[in-house]
Amino acid sequence: MKVKARFGIIVTTLLLGTTACLNGCATMGMGKTEATKTTAKVETAETGLKQTLAQVDATQASLNSLIEPSQADVKNKFEAYSADVEKTEKMAKQLEKDQAKMQEQQREYLAEWEKKERTYTDPSLREASGQRRAALNSAYSEVPKASTQFQDALNGYLSQVKQIQTQLSLDLTNKGIESITPAAQKALSDGGRLKDTAEPVITAMERVMSEMAREGSGAAAGGQ
């Protein structure tokens, strides 16, 4: 009887241990998945930002080529410029969507983190988790601040190059090109400063990814 009783205790202990392990692994896996999703959204937004800047460079080049005085191939250059303007506008809209998705994922990730954190009974673990979450939240908050300034500058630039495109579609003559040259030069100047405006956004995004990688933040959210 004693042997059976001991055997029953061993089996029960093993079953409880297995259940705890499965629950812990599931929680841990979910945390890592959310961390991976969050990092991926930031990477997508950063890649989109860099691609948009490259497209702005292409638009700058085609506009600069278009306003050269006394040129013969005006029609083809205008078509190239128009195509670049449309690409830039399309990429700017996609960038805005990517940044919105990134911020939504970040909010969900931190909310899930905080929810799990409240279940911790170990005060030192709860405190450590709270500090890591606060560090990530601080990094996240810098992205929308920097993004707003860049987005405003990009939208202003797009407005300029689109108005130039519209005017030249009405008057693609040497005189017409000459008349929009001051506006084009302003657009070129503003476009040239976009990279400087984008730099804080890129820095903020890279800080987020650095914080995500530091000390296994995904594991912390998952309850490790």
Model-derived regions: residue spans:
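C-terminal motif of bacterial Sec signal peptides marking the signal peptidase cleavage site
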Residues: 19-24
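Immediate post-signal-peptide N-terminus of mature secreted/exported proteins
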Residues: 26-90
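Long amphipathic all-alpha helical oligomerization modules
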Residues: 30-40, 155-224
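Core hydrophobic alpha-helical transmembrane segments of single-pass membrane proteins
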Residues: 15-16
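Bacterial N-terminal signal peptides that target proteins for export
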Residues: 2-11
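Long amphipathic alpha-helices with heptad-repeat character
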Residues: 42-56, 85-88, 92-106, 143, ...
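Extended amphipathic alpha-helical interaction segments
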Residues: 98, 102-182, 199, 214-215
